[in-house]
């Protein structure tokens, strides 16, 4: 295979959950800008319409649909529709997620931190816990299940799950439900990768570190937060969604054909320890 073909995704049928903003939008852009046909699924109808229209106007083959990944029947129908439209389903990004509110401390590394009662274990409500698990773990399960239904008969496909550095590293500013769900999503990635490997389907995870998105109420978008946290990251800066585009394209492409069951971290070295 020529090197130019290793990262070729032109004509691929792609679905991205949570694709109208943040990391999901970066994934959608990465694939669409390289000739893939992309369906954005997201809960936010206004953002779905805005981003799909923007990318279409730029000359890319992008459509959108409003879907809540906790509604598994609606999710199945949306993925079925995309596969029917494209005549194939080559790549699915299981990306949709929500944050879980405050952890047991308020503030990121480098910021003034104090324990907060709303993040304490004994104050965690069933509703809060279940909401995060329903989206960040059960939603991933439902997305992988729907993808497998289309990919297994074709004996081909790429599934990419968004996990988190928090799947392996405890961060007290993050709610425990989020970390538990992301850890579960990574283990699910490995389980499904093992099951589907014999069918030529790869299943991998992208684990972002501190990336500037709207999650967490947009706290990461504050310049002062970026400057403070960035000092403790070995690369001396926080990450942005565009930092994930290259990996997203690689994992979706023929170049990653012999990689499965892996979680690849993009965190500027944060998981290695603090920089001076």
Q: What positions do the PLM features span?
A:
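Short C-terminal tail/terminal secondary-structure segment
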Residues: 1-6, 249, 260-276
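Canonical Rossmann dinucleotide-binding motif of NAD(H)/NADP(H)-dependent dehydrogenases/reductases
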Residues: 3-39
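The beta1-alpha1 cofactor-binding region of Rossmann-like NAD(H)/NADP(H)-dependent oxidoreductases
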Residues: 45-46, 65-79, 126, 243
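Catalytic Tyr-X3-Lys loop
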Residues: 98, 111-141, 156, 160, ...
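Alpha-helical segment proximal to the catalytic Tyr-Lys
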Residues: 149, 194-195, 257
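Short, small/polar-rich loop/turn modules that mediate ligand/substrate recognition or access, typified
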Residues: 197, 202, 259-261
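A conserved structural motif in NAD(P)-dependent oxidoreductases
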Residues: 233-244
């Amino acid at each position: 295979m020529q090197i130019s073909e290793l990262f070729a995704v032109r004509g691929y049928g792609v679905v991205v959950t949570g694709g109208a903003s943040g990391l999901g939008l970066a994934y959608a852009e990465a694939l669409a800008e390289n000739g893939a046909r992309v369906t954005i699924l997201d809960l936010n109808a206004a953002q779905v319409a805005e981003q799909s229209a923007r990318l279409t106007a730029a000359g890319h083959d992008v459509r959108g649909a409003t879907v809540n990944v906790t509604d598994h029947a609606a999710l199945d129908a949306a993925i079925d529709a995309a596969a029917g439209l494209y005549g194939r389903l080559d790549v699915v990004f299981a990306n949709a997620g929500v944050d879980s509110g405050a952890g047991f401390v308020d503030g990121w590394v480098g910021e003034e931190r104090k324990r907060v009662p709303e993040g304490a274990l004994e104050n965690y409500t069933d509703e809060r816990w279940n909401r995060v698990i329903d989206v960040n773990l059960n939603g991933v399960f439902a997305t992988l299940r729907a993808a497998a239904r289309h990919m297994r008969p074709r004996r081909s496909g790429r599934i990419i799950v968004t996990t988190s550095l928090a799947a392996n590293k405890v961060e007290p500013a993050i709610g425990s439900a989020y970390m538990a769900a992301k850890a579960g999503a990574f283990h699910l990635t490995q389980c499904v990768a093992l099951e589907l490997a014999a069918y030529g389907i790869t299943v991998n995870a992208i684990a972002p570190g501190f990336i500037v998105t709207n999650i967490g109420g947009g706290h990461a978008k504050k310049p002062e937060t970026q400057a403070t946290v960035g000092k403790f990251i070995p690369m001396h800066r926080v990450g942005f969604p565009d930092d994930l585009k290259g990996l997203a394209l690689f994992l979706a492409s023929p170049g990653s054909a012999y990689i499965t069951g892996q979680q690849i971290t993009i965190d500027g070295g944060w998981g290695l320890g603090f920089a001076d």
